[in-house]
Amino acid sequence: MAVTTHPLQEFYSGPDVPLSSGPDRARRQARMLAAVLRGVAGPAVILDLGCGDGSALAVATTQNPRHRFAGIDWSGDALRRAHALGLTVLRGSVSPRLPVADGVADVVIMSELIEHLVDPDAAVAEARRVLRPGGSLLLSTPNLAAWYNRGLLAAGIQPVFSEVSLRGVFGRPGRVVAGHLRLFTRRALTGFLTASGFRCVTVTGARYHDVPRPLGPLDRAFCRWPSAASILLVHARKE
């Protein structure tokens, strides 16, 4: 497969970009996946797009040993780490095309990937292409309308998760540049997925690991209302 680099791919291959999903995200992803796989009769094929260093994929693989897993990422460093964990991984990108045949996957995972993409339409179309009919998409992404972002924006402060530059953080809390390009509210995300040929089965909320500790209980409470939660979790099926 020919590999073409561009500035964003160089950014995500850089040494300062986090490669690990973190324990909270890994456990959350494994729980979502386990719930979906309960309805699958035989061994399923699961693709993790933007798998990073494979930390979340390793947890899911351990908890679901009878199923087949593969991760796809652009970062060579991330893939080396994932391979060292004994995982099946491929180097590739959701644009223009994944290195996977049509209709091979029972489940596609896009865990906090879509917010990093220039062309989410193409990415979700690729996820749909590689899914079998009725296959599941498990997608998570930061919520633009998280409870604290509503107050920040009203005060004239750039919302958490949003970024105006890859060079530094400007006008919002936090210090890490994550490369977020697209942010969604619950309504925008479900509308987008429906227009992309998916039926949204469930939408739930999750907490954000970087919320200051005193605000942790409040962040957990808002998980009951996904439209105001920190993280949006969607299970959608290919129509």
Locate each region found by the language model.
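Conserved SAM-binding loop
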Residues: 33-151, 185-186, 190, 233-238
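A short, well-structured juxtamembrane/interface segment
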Residues: 25-35
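S-adenosyl-L-methionine-dependent methyltransferase catalytic module, highlighting the catalytic core
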Residues: 4-27, 55, 118-126, 130, ...
